[in-house]
Amino acid sequence: YCTLGIPMLQGYGLSEASPVISSNCPQRYRFGSSGQVVKPLELKICDETGTEVKKGEKGEIVIRGKNVMKGYWKNEKSTAGTIRDGWLYTGDRGYLGEDGSLFVSGRFKSLLIAGDGEKYSPEGIEEAIAELSPYIDYCVLYNNQSPYTAGLIVPNKTALTEYVKQREEEPGTVEACKLMLTKLNEELMKFRKGGMYEGMFPERWLPAVVGILPEPLTAQNGTVNSTSKVVRHKVYEVFREELDFLYTPEGKDIRNPRNTKNMK
């Protein structure tokens, strides 16, 4: 946007903080960051034990100030888990740059966790896949100490139907569905070695297996909220069967019978 002459200044906030925590401004901004912490708000980055870490080290974003809520209405349990000794534990992961700029990297509850314990925030990958591929509406990644990362995909069936028509295949047939799945695989391979977006993300966190969801993500099934943001734990819950299938020998091939059926 800045290249086009449209200034866009990123910030960060929560409803629990009324809501602004940090922001860039025209006089001082740093691309990729959420800017400087609003005064007189206090902010620190803490590790899993609640100990403050050094600048540049990632951890949970923790804040304190008069703008922080006193608690959740009639929900003492949630309040106790969020506010401790006057500090609000946001549940967001990030770090502070040397100049004090805040960088937000994702939600702790959404972290991918590999079998060796390494962790990674999936949001950037998921957003890039959906934004850069016209054939994918949603991508939700999963790895909970698993041998590889799985991807749950909501395809753009309108775009894929047009794609198979251009290749003179009749939409709805098994062959057309397999052609759609092959195209989706090609889109995902663009993020791997030799692809258009090679190096954008570490390959171990890219989806090694893909499941096509049998229905869209909607507010009705609870998988997205009122602002169309993915409710990750609900996606895992609603589509548990599809997710488990991806860790079977049959599920490793994107053109498996289950995916083929869900493409119709």
Task: List where the protein language model places each region.
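Gly/Ser/Thr-rich phosphate-binding loop
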Residues: Y1-Y29, P134
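AMP-binding/adenylate-forming catalytic core of the ANL superfamily
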Residues: G65, K70-G71, R93-W205, P216, ...
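Conserved C-terminal "lid"/linker of ANL adenylate-forming enzymes
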Residues: Y138-Y142, P147, K190-K264
